[in-house]
Regions:
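Pepsin/retropepsin-fold aspartyl endopeptidases
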Residues: 231-232, 237-247
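Structural motif
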Residues: 12-15, 44-47, 60-62, 68-71, ...
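Anionic-ligand-binding alpha/beta catalytic cores of soluble enzymes and soluble regulatory domains
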Residues: 100-180
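A conserved acidic, glycine/proline-rich C-terminal tail/linker
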Residues: 166-234
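Alpha-helical scaffold segments in soluble metabolic enzymes
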Residues: 3-4, 32-35, 80, 112-119
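Active-site histidine-anchored catalytic micro-motif
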Residues: 25-31, 39-43, 47-50, 55-111
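N-terminal glycine-rich anion-binding loop in soluble enzyme alpha/beta folds
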Residues: 1-21
Length: 247
């Protein structure tokens, strides 16, 4: 893919965000791009290839926001970008003369998405790639929900390589936990715990202790100081998280 891009646009500056998205996991890809893209300069072209439907009739799309461009399959991988942006143009990429000849049905990242991204970065304007569409695939991110007056239920969105359990609970969902001195609560993950402390950093936790911390992704994380909360709690992606406040 990089070779294709550089062959078309030798001056391209290619930055790898990640190659650690879980295989076939469109939501994991959506989470990765949504957390990274806004830190890049205006005009950046983001090539997002998490494409378990490669070779099927799913559409290649070009999404343009106020500051960024995204080239991706139309499978929902840009759903969290749609959630963050207010001015969006989405186009079905149909201009096949920008694709590589003799296209494979198993590697559209190389044969379709990379040459489109390279030509876009080189200066070809978005309308040249295809017409706008409004029926693009978009899924709703899972949101925490109240179970009763004192209990909030969420899930684990992701386990990072350190074993931190990243929940879908944002500060506005649990404002009482945003203070590191918060008391009168307990958190369970998959029924295990309880976790009764919010720390201001990973290093503030005691060795072997599982605790909550507000992470850089903007969500509540369950972590362990120099350890794996995932292993300590036997929990993974999709596990239920319960936050119970004292009555």
């Amino acid at each position: 893919m990089k070779g294709v891009i550089l062959d078309i646009f030798p001056d391209a500056h290619i930055v790898d965000i990640t190659h650690a998205v879980q295989p076939f996991d469109v939501f994991d890809g959506a989470l990765a791009i949504s957390q990274a893209y806004s830190y890049f300069p205006s005009g950046t072209v983001h090539l997002v290839v998490v494409d378990p439907g490669v070779g099927t009739p799913r559409r290649p799309i070009l999404v343009t926001t106020e500051r960024h461009h995204f080239v991706a399959p139309d499978n929902g991988v840009l759903s969290l970008v749609y959630d963050r942006e207010t001015r969006i143009s989405t186009r079905h990429i149909t201009a096949e003369h920008y694709f590589l000849p003799n296209r494979s049905n198993t590697f559209h990242g190389r044969d379709i998405f990379s040459p489109v991204a390279a030509n876009l970065a080189k200066g070809v304007s978005p309308p040249n790639f295809g017409d706008e569409i409004t029926d693009y695939v978009r899924f709703a991110a899972p949101r925490p929900k109240p179970a009763d007056e004192r209990t909030l239920r969420g899930i684990i969105l992701k386990v990072d390589r350190f074993g931190n359990l990243i929940t879908n609970i944002a500060p506005q969902d649990a404002p009482a936990l945003t203070n590191a001195t918060a008391t009168g609560f307990k958190i369970t993950v998959g029924g295990k715990g309880p976790i009764t402390r919010i720390c201001s950093s990973y290093a503030d936790g005691a060795p072997g202790e599982t605790f909550g911390v507000w992470g850089s992704m903007g969500f509540l994380e369950i972590a362990a100081n120099r350890g794996s909360a995932a292993q300590l709690l036997g929990a993974g992606k999709g596990a239920e998280v319960s936050v119970m406040m004292a009555g």
